[in-house]
């Protein structure tokens, strides 16, 4: 499955979400087998170092940590396009899941950019601040969005960043669906 897609209709996202969820189910079954057939130390070594999970889009075997990170980023991106579609219902969007420079979500011929991530903390790897600074430097685009999920970002944090970066809409999802 391509890691760059153009979404013309919000219903097109269902195919990708279903693929991701099916591959996560496959991964859960593989993980259960590892747990059933190994002691704790061996199981955790396998989880960390071997390709024992299913990559969420391609279905190829991949490292568990990569699968966890990719699945959540893909799902956040889908949720972001669903969010943007409510604001811009006639706009087609490009979702870029490749690991290359650029933005995660851009319109087909429009003035919107978005970045997406999930992390154990919004401070992890400085991702939020790096994205916001990069957005602030982009004076050509008028609609900028940061979409993410974590467990410790509060309304106080949002206000702090909103004051610092007033031209960027920060959207912290409450759950990943």
Task: Spell out what each predicted region is.
Residues 1-51:
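Nuclease-adjacent, charged terminal/linker segments that flank catalytic cores
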Residues 24, 31, 80-88, 135-139, ...:
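Hydrophobic, Leu/Ile/Phe/Ala-enriched alpha-helical segments that form helix-helix packing faces
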Residues 39, 49-96:
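Acidic-basic catalytic patches of nuclease active cores, encompassing PD-(D/E)XK
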Residues 89, 108-111, 139-143:
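Short glycine/proline-enriched coil/turn segments at helix->beta-strand junctions
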Residues 99-102:
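Short acidic/glycine-enriched loop/turn segments that link adjacent beta-strands
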Residues 105-122:
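Conserved catalytic cores of phosphodiester-cleaving nucleases, focusing on short active-site segments
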Residues 118-170:
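Catalytic cores of nucleic-acid endonucleases
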Residues 169-177:
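A generic structural motif
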